[in-house]
C-alpha cells in the first residue's frame, strides 16, 4: 500500500498503537495518524520511534472556537503544544486538520496562516453524515458565508510557491461545490483501489456511507478471498451508484492522482490568474450564482445535502455497549478511560489563554 491513515475516535487512547504502526510499516509506504493531540507524551514517543510518520492534529479553529466545538478543556493548547514539540524534533509531516462549519469558518484563514507560519501542513474538510460519524443531521446553514471563507483560503493557497498548496486549492474549490450539494468534481473509486477497516476487522469502501457497507471481515477471510468475494462486488455496485457526493481527502486524493488532467488544468489556469493579480471567486461555481440570484432556495440546497432530520442513526454498537451508555455521555466514558491511564479528565469549559 502506498498510504494508510489511522483515525478514530482517538487513536492514541490505544496503548498498543506503536505495535500497530510497526506492523503497518511492513505493508504501507506512508502512514498518517489523525489525532486530537491530547496525549502529547504518547505522540512524542511514537514520533521518536517512527520519525517518518505523519501526524495531523484536529484543531477546529482558534482557541475559543476549538475548545467550544470539541468540548476539550485546554484542547487547543494541548494540540498546539504537541505540534510545536514535533516540529522542534525535526518532523516535517505534521500539521493541522480542520473540519469547517458555520461556527468556525471565520477562523479558517487565520488558522491556515498560523500553520503556514509554523511551516506545517493544513488539511481541511467539511461536515459529513454517515454511520461512522453516528450523525445524520450535520448541515451547513450559511453556505455563502462558509464558501466565502473557503474562497479566501483558496486565494491564499494560490499565492504560495508550493505546487502542493495549489492542488489543495482545488480540493477546497471542491468543498464549496460539496456544501452546495453538487455532484463530485471527480469520480469516486472507493472499494476499487481504496478501503476502510474498522477495529473489528470489517472492511468497507469508506466511512461516508449512510449505513455500514461491509465487504467482508479479515478475522474470518483472507484478504484475497474478501477482496474478490461476491459480497465485495455487491458493495462496489452500490458505490458505482452512490449519490452522496462526499468530498473527503481519503477519496479525493486518490482521484486527483488518477484523474490528474482535470485538477491540473484547474491549477494551471488559476495559478496563472493569481500571478496576474486576479483572484479566484466562489461564483465560478454556477450553483453559487444560482443561489445568489434566487434561482434556487436554501430549502432546495438543503434537500441536496445528506442531512436527514428524521433519520435514526445506527451507531453499530452492541446491546451491551448501548446499555453501558445509558445515562452517560460518550465523553464520560472516555474521561474514565483517560483517568485510568493517569491523565486529567477533560471539562466542557476552558479559561486558559494562549499567546501566539
Question: Over which residues does each language-model region extend?
Answer:
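Short Fe-S-cluster ligation motifs
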Residues: 1-7, 237-245, 273-296
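Radical SAM enzyme [4Fe-4S]-AdoMet core and its adjacent flexible, acidic
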Residues: 23, 27-29, 49, 53-60, ...
Amino acid at each position: 500500500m502506498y498510504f494508510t491513515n489511522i483515525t478514530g475516535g482517538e487513536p492514541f487512547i490505544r496503548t498498543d498503537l506503536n505495535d500497530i504502526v510497526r506492523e503497518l510499516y511492513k505493508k504501507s509506504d506512508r502512514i498518517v495518524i489523525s489525532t486530537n493531540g491530547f496525549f502529547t507524551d504518547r505522540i512524542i514517543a511514537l514520533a521518536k520511534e517512527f520519525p517518518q510518520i505523519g501526524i495531523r492534529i484536529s484543531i477546529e479553529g482558534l482557541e475559543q472556537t476549538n475548545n467550544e466545538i470539541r468540548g476539550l478543556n485546554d484542547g487547543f493548547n494541548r494540540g498546539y503544544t504537541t505540534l510545536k514539540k514535533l516540529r522542534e524534533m525535526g518532523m516535517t509531516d505534521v500539521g493541522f486538520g480542520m473540519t469547517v462549519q458555520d461556527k468556525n469558518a471565520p477562523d479558517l484563514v487565520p488558522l491556515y496562516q498560523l500553520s503556514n507560519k509554523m511551516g506545517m501542513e493544513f488539511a481541511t474538510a467539511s461536515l459529513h453524515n454517515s454511520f461512522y460519524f453516528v450523525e445524520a443531521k450535520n448541515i451547513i446553514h450559511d453556505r455563502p458565508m462558509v464558501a466565502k471563507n473557503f474562497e479566501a483560503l483558496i486565494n491564499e493557497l494560490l499565492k504560495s510557491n508550493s505546487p502542493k498548496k495549489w492542488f489543495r486549492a482545488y480540493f477546497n474549490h471542491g468543498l464549496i461545490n460539496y456544501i452546495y450539494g453538487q455532484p463530485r468534481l471527480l469520480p469516486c473509486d472507493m472499494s476499487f483501489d481504496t478501503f476502510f477497516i474498522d477495529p473489528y476487522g470489517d472492511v468497507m469502501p469508506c466511512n461516508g456511507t449512510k449505513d455500514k457497507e461491509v465487504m467482508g471481515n479479515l478475522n474470518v477471510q483472507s484478504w484475497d478471498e474478501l477482496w474478490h468475494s461476491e459480497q465485495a462486488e455487491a458493495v462496489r455496485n452500490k458505490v458505482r451508484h452512490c449519490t452522496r457526493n462526499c468530498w473527503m481527502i481519503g477519496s479525493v486524493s486518490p482521484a486527483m492522482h488518477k484523474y490528474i488532467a482535470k485538477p491540473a488544468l484547474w491549477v494551471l489556469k488559476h495559478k496563472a490568474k493569481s500571478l496576474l493579480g486576479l483572484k479566484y471567486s466562489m461564483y465560478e461555481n454556477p450553483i453559487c450564482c444560482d443561489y445568489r440570484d434566487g434561482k434556487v432556495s436554501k430549502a432546495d440546497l438543503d434537500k441536496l445535502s445528506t442531512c436527514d432530520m428524521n433519520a435514526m442513526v445506527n451507531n453499530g454498537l452492541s446491546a451491551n455497549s448501548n446499555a453501558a451508555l445509558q445515562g452517560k455521555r460518550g465523553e464520560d466514558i472516555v474521561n474514565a478511560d483517560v483517568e485510568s491511564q493517569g491523565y486529567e479528565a477533560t471539562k466542557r469549559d476552558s479559561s486558559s489563554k494562549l499567546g501566539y
